[in-house]
Amino acid sequence: LKSEGIGADCSSYTELLMSDAVGLKGHDIMFSSNVTPAEDFKKAAELGAIINFDDVSLIDFYEEIGAPFLETMCCRYNPGGNFTLHNEIMDTPKDAKYGMTKEQMKEAFTKLKAHGVKHFGIHAFLASNTVALGYYPKLARILFELAVELSKEVGVHIAFVNLSGGVGIAYRPD
């Protein structure tokens, strides 16, 4: 995968070690985790991975453990409510335990900016096993509108928007 220019989406220390073993480093690794042990954060920082904070409280924990704030960091957004497409509920972000509200995103970006972070990413994962063609355009609109708002209100550089996974497989033809 590395030779094809594909990186790794890691959520654990073991996955970080596996990425390192195949030569992935830096922005080739996105580290998204919740209930994250200190050693996982430190390993992700050591590898220069893009650390994707799932909860605003993790930023304080990250500071407490003495992990270095990197130039580029990311936060996971959860818009709440139901994520619908063509009157069909794709998933229910309001019930998800992952991600931050818009106000928490502002707080998180403000904290990260105060720690010297220069480039910010926004990530969201709103539905699983998605085969609907309109999912990614709708998700992109939500995230890019948020990016503009955060850039203006918090005064940060939004370096990227990550539409995450959730790609489904149509096991039977429609």
Residue map of PLM features:
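Active-site-proximal beta-alpha core segment in soluble small-molecule metabolic enzymes
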Residues: 1-160, 169
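A conserved active-site cap/scaffold subdomain adjacent to cofactor or substrate pockets
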Residues: 167-174
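Structured binding elements
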Residues: 163
